[in-house]
Structure formats: structure tokens, C-alpha cells
Design a protein with these regions (language model features):
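Extracytoplasmic
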Residues: 5-7
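Short strand-connecting beta-turns/loops that link adjacent beta-strands
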Residues: 61-62, 166
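Extracytoplasmic/lumenal domain signature
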Residues: 9-42, 46, 78-125, 132-160, ...
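Short loop/turn segments immediately following the C-termini of beta-strands
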Residues: 1, 25, 70, 166
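Soluble metallo-hydrolase cores and metallopeptidase-like ectodomains found primarily
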Residues: 49-51
């Protein structure tokens, strides 16, 4: 029911006391960085952009959590915004259909990558992030789904795999 639809979040709790240490909302609020990507939609209506209850992944070398985030509701732009025209589409409706890299001590978003801005097709990107150590030199002509900012250097450690179709780096 519509009464159960809410703004989603990821939270960390103290393992001894159970007290919440931080909370990061998975849809940028009106006053948050990235909030303008939702247009005039009130923060309370930026819903269902969820991690689905799936676990995140942790990189101990970089001390980062990686979490996959789902689609917004309703499923089409016209239902969410009342129009198909959303202007500049990239990024759009952050942090839907994204990977979030989160600082585990503070809950701050270190970086994000949005796979499908302004999703109208219910294309979830929430599966666990598979962390790999490898050097890649991607050719965007040969690999359909690839982060165009990746470059083949040993220093680059922002490669996070989303396995399955339409998975990619």
C-alpha cells in the first residue's frame, strides 16, 4: 500500500549498544548534494530508491562500503514528475540505479556511479558489488556497459563489478 512507501536509507549501528551511528538516504533530499537532480519533487516523494535489503560489499584496503541502489517509484518519469521532459538527464534522480561508495566511519558518500539516469524500465542495479583487483584497459567500443572514466592503471581502484546481465565495470 502507498502508506508503506517511504524514503529509504542505509544505516550503521554500534555493535555493542545498538545505537545508530549514521544514516545515508539513498535518494538525495532537496537540500542534499545531488538534490536538484530530482527537480521540484518534494523530498518526501523521493521514494523506493532502496538497497532492497541486500548486503553491501567492503573494501578493507580503501576502507569503503559499496552498495547497489534500486529504482525510484513510480516507475515512469511522467508518473513521478508529471512530464517526460526532465532536462539534463545525467545525473538524474540521484542515487537511483547507482553504486554508492560510502565511508564506513561517517556514512559520507565518497563517490557514486549512476548506471541508468531517469529510469522508466524498472532496471534495478542493486545486486552485491563484486570487488576485484585487476588492471584493465577498457575499450568502450568492445564493452557495452562500462564506466567511461576507468583507465588502465594499477593506481585506479574504483572498479566495482555488478555481475549478471546487464553487468559491467
Amino acid at each position: 500500500p502507498a502508506s508503506l512507501i517511504a524514503r529509504c536509507f542505509i544505516a550503521a549501528h554500534d555493535s555493542d549498544s545498538g545505537v545508530e551511528r549514521w544514516r545515508v538516504y539513498t535518494a538525495a533530499g532537496a537540500d542534499d548534494p545531488g538534490g536538484v537532480t530530482w527537480g521540484d519533487l518534494p523530498t518526501a516523494k523521493r521514494v523506493h530508491v532502496s538497497p532492497w535489503g541486500l548486503p553491501g560489499s567492503y573494501d578493507p584496503e580503501l576502507d569503503l562500503l559499496y552498495w547497489g541502489i534500486a529504482v525510484p517509484l513510480p516507475y515512469t518519469r511522467i508518473a513521478r514528475r508529471g512530464t517526460w521532459d526532465v532536462g539534463d538527464r545525467t545525473p538524474c534522480e540521484l542515487y537511483s540505479n547507482s553504486t554508492l561508495a560510502i565511508e564506513p566511519d561517517t556514512g559520507e558518500i565518497n563517490w557514486y556511479y549512476q548506471y541508468l539516469p531517469c529510469d522508466d524500465w524498472d532496471q534495478d542495479f542493486v545486486q552485491e558489488r563484486t570487488l576485484i583487483d585487476t588492471v584493465v584497459n577498457p575499450d568502450p567500443k568492445a564493452v557495452r556497459w562500462i564506466n567511461p572514466t576507468l583507465r588502465g592503471t594499477a593506481e585506479e581502484r574504483k572498479g566495482v563489478g555488478v555481475m549478471g546481465e546487464p553487468g559491467g565495470l
